[in-house]
């Protein structure tokens, strides 16, 4: 009877999964519908806690915002990108955005749900990116937040957890769980994105950069630099799922598509 109740409860939770459209297509035409089991509010609240945990932990080691010029540069780029996020979702410019630079040799950057950005000094020091290239990185990471890829991945993880929980209960095996804040940290810092998520972030990222007055072709030169790191293996944070050549080709196509937006926007900056 208990097993039956667990099964019914789990199936009910799965049935409650919503199909949503998180963003408008934009010029790049990203319009995939997504299945969500958890609300934006829940994920964003957990992401805010997760971000504070990560930043506070780094600050205690003296690893946050050590170089004033670096921080000013990163935040200036963020302040140009954030207003144009409204192209894809009207609520995004009003998010409680935060941008910090973390001192680490790791070539990394990320944006947690709700607009919590971190750029690592290893990325800046090792790649020596131009502003266009740095905008490409940040636009890509912001795109993950706009598309709510974090929420989608949490939903997938919870769905898998429900299924495993039912199977475990039937087998008499207890399934340990991870709280939402810990799950957000794990997915953001430790787990690579899927090919589908990376491609969407690439395409939306170049449009964000272009609309903010950054040359979208910076994404191409950035990826070429990425490919030279580690003997041709790009960093983990930009998943290796899309092959190097396919990714470059896709970036060329979509950078060209949004080039008129850049030509118009750069006159304002």
Predicted regions and their residues:
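A Zn2+-metalloprotease active-site environment signal
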Residues: 2-5, 17-269
